[in-house]
Swiss-Prot record:
UniProt name for this protein: Cytochrome c oxidase subunit 2
Positions on the Mitochondrial matrix side per record topology: 46-59
Source domain of life: Eukaryota
Binding site for Cu cation A2: C196, E198, C200, H204
Spans within the Mitochondrial intermembrane topological domain: 1-14, 88-227
Gene Ontology biological process: ATP synthesis coupled electron transport
Length: 227
């Protein structure tokens, strides 16, 4: 869950988000070391009185600053590619949910059930109850079982949208005429908030997403009541 004046990423709830956080820290450390080295060299160049005017080239230095950046890029690319392949893998999902973006709300369909579908609209500010979050609460939450692989099929009825839930490491474009897919798995129960992350018109900011992750027994009870 995000909080005011937050500077870092949200706490990870899924294995993919855990991997993304580790990759972020890994890459940030490399960038920090490179920046420190460059600033150190610049400070030396600005403060030293020594000059080396007789040397026109230095092959050893050129070799180092050619090979070293290549090694650094490999160290960044390999874990990045690993995570990309992990995000694309969809192995035997336990549940499939289709979501469609509209101006300006989301609709959901549980394809494993005959008649389980609903629209999800933002609750206006004047109708919020004490403790509820402005611009993030919806009238119908997406209830899903925790610790199970869920496949999301995402598309749009009108313009470009983007279905994003940061704490699960999810962000998939909803494109008219195209069906994109992604998977999610929450490791603990709770409410997880997201929003449309693609400018889609005047009410773009009023398309929240709320996932309610519950144990399987609670999900089965909820789905039986909804059907």
């Amino acid at each position: 869950m995000a909080y005011p004046f937050q500077l870092g990423l949200q706490d990870a709830t899924s294995p993919i988000m855990e991997e993304l956080l580790h990759f972020h820290d890994h890459t940030l450390m490399i960038v920090f070391l490179i920046s420190s080295l460059v600033l150190y060299i610049i400070s030396l160049m600005l403060t030293t009185k020594l000059t080396h005017t007789s040397t026109m080239d230095a092959q050893e230095v050129e070799t180092v600053w050619t090979i070293l950046p290549a090694i650094i890029l490999v160290l960044i690319a390999l874990p990045s590619l690993r995570i990309l392949y992990m995000m694309d893998e969809i192995n035997n999902p336990s549940l499939t949910v289709k979501t469609m973006g509209h101006q300006w709300y989301w609709s959901y369909e549980y394809t494993d059930y005959e008649d389980l579908n609903f629209d999800s609209y933002m609750i206006p500010t004047q109708e919020l109850k004490p403790g509820e979050l402005r611009l993030l609460e919806v009238d119908n939450r997406v209830v899903l079982p925790m610790e199970m692989t869920v496949r999301m099929l995402i598309s749009s009825e009108d313009v470009l949208h983007s279905w994003a839930v940061p704490s699960l490491g999810l962000k998939t474009d909803a494109i008219p005429g195209r069906l994109n897919q992604t998977t999610l798995m929450a490791m603990r129960p709770g409410l997880y908030y997201g929003q449309c992350s693609e400018i889609c018109g005047s009410n773009h900011s009023f398309m929240p997403i709320v996932l309610e992750m519950v144990p399987l027994s609670y999900f089965e009870t909820w789905s039986a009541l909804m059907v």
